[in-house]
Amino acid sequence: MIAELADVREDVPHADVAVVGAGFAGIDLAVQLGRRGLRVLLIEAGRDSFDPAAQDLARFSNVGKPLREPDPEGPHNPYLDRAFRGETRIRQFGGTSTIWTGKWRLLNPLTFQQREWVPGSGWPITREELLPFHAEVARDHGIGDVDALPDGGRHHPLAQECTAAGIDSSLLHWQASPLRMAERYRDELRAMPNVQVLLGATATELVLDDAHRRVRTVVVRSLGGHRAELSADQVVLATGGLEPARLLLASDRQLPEGIGNAHGLVGRYFQDHPKTKRAVLRPSPALRRMADWLATDPLPRDQLLFGLSLEEQRRHRLLDHAVSVRPVFDYELDYPAADVVAVREALRNRSLRGLTRATLARAAAPRTLRQYVGQRVHRRRRGRVAHYATAIYLEQAPNPESRLRLGARRDALGMRELEIDWQLSPLDHESFGRLQGLLTDAFARAGLGELDFGPDELTLADAGDANHHIGATRMAARPEEGVVDRDCRVFGTDNLYIATASVFPTGECATPTFTIAALARRLSAHLLALRDDERAPALRAPGDQ
């Protein structure tokens, strides 16, 4: 059943599991649990189609390094409905899967390990524990053989040269038609008698029992003034990387510091992936012949990514990173490419620091602008490769001073809006500074070509973000170190869980969706085990007896 809160005239029945948020993780949880017979209540703030008033409830303020505003005319936006362009999180049935670009990538093994040079690193679960759930998700969504993904990047023509130079080549699978969770599962959810989907219902407060151990009710409100108190044995927050912390902090009537915040960690350790497109790769003859390996169209395809090997990262005490490269053909670009890219990224990130007057003058020349417009119009033609445009994605080190907190401004439902204080640490800056020279040398040794970071000093002040919101309710072995335990259960509670990238202790530089999906499947298995055995036996991986 799918209904709007405003249309519900009777009390909503008690559920086995209430899932707040109907995006990638929330819908997957509801489907998996519903198929096994659990009574599931799926609660979504948005409606079945895009509603600007509901979207406005997701507003936040930047008080630290600003999160960038996406380019509405960027290369991944034209296929989207115009209402979505420039949005990074969608309040609608289907969540942000509605605008997702379809990129799947595994986290590397080093991410899960405690690295002595990265304070706060290490996961309380292993990569091996999560891989069976990755495989299950990959099977269901046509991603291919998960076991082959780690080695798949080692079969290109320059693979041996890259390995010898200390460069790892990895794969990012890019779907031709990105998975839209609402489109795929709407009919199945509507037909399940044991699943109720409630739209237009924003969770504004979690009410605990007298012992402050269990969530007794989830208070939801609609923009039309309707209010309901919903109950379930187990409650899961699947509301993206920002909203779980907001709801925990806002639920402060019984616990002044908010739920799960006994150690003041809710909202702290917020991370994103700093990203820059300033570097240009002038390809070697061998790399020119690999243009079809590296082009980003047609889709689907497994896109190659380059980066220093895990051994080199450990040796040089670096944070993780990945370099994607795209062939730019000579008809596209015969003007000062690095200058135009530098100015474009600076404007997008609202910072002109690091740009010289000469760079600005070259980029603003009339001939340069005419040629830039021309290459945008004719971007899909083929010809001789002039160079490779790059995007460098960087891991952010865990940093307790990088945080989310409640601001003074309130939304239309009376909830305090988030303030995002995104802060990069000295380790982030030092790692990126060393990385540029090491990458340049390694690319040359591998025969890939000359990596040019431009004439101006490139720092993280010039970098934007990747819209990957990570870490604000981090997973840990102890409540003194995080907000949720290894089963994604909020410390200090018995029945409250979080299933978003906000539980990642670290997120390397990979797109987070694949890992979010795997964690949601793992949580499904845990909740099913709770139903089958009140003593909560050890978590079973798919296929285990």
Predicted ranges, named:
Residues 1-17, 35-36, 529-544:
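Extreme N-terminal leader/targeting segments of oxidoreductases
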Residues 23-24, 242, 503:
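Residue-level detector of alpha-helix initiation sites
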Residues 15-42:
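N-terminal Rossmann-like FAD-binding beta1-loop-alpha1 element of flavoenzymes
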Residues 81-87, 263-266, 273-416, 466-469, ...:
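FAD cofactor-binding and catalytic pocket of flavoenzymes
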Residues 76, 80, 103, 116-210, ...:
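Conserved redox-cofactor binding core of oxidoreductases
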Residues 61-150, 397-400, 407:
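Redox-cofactor-proximal catalytic regions of oxidoreductases
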Residues 35, 46-56, 206, 219-294, ...:
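Glycine-rich loop(s) and the adjacent beta-strand/alpha-helix scaffold that form part
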Residues 198-211, 374-403, 413-507, 513:
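A glycine-rich dinucleotide-binding beta-alpha-beta segment and adjacent secondary-structure elements
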